[in-house]
């Protein structure tokens, strides 16, 4: 019986020797390929208002909860500069209310009927 054990020990040592070179030599890693990148469609936004868009501005924009030039530009498909000018016009007419003004971002919200009428009474 003891000779059989010695043979098994020799076999296991041979197996370990065979496995070691395989573990040491790793396969070469694949080169990472460059991605093509994302392609964006060109925006074709209006530079000046047409009648339909101007009506939509007065009808829909005062009902938005959050009003910024970016939101108006995206929804009405107009340029950012045109959206800023339009929001200033709506503000001057009292249709929207200024929330925050920063050099880079202006935020407006819709006028609630109670605060719009109540504000002039307190001043007078």
UniProtKB/Swiss-Prot annotation:
Q: Which domain of life is it from?
A: Eukaryota
Report biased composition (Basic and acidic residues) as residue ranges: 1-22
Q: Where in the cell is it found?
A: Cytoplasm
Per the record's keyword annotation, is Ribosomal protein included, yes or no? yes
Write out the transmembrane intervals: none
- Which InterPro entries does the entry link to? Ribosomal_eS25
Annotated stretches, region: Disordered: 1-37
Q: What is this protein called?
A: Small ribosomal subunit protein eS25
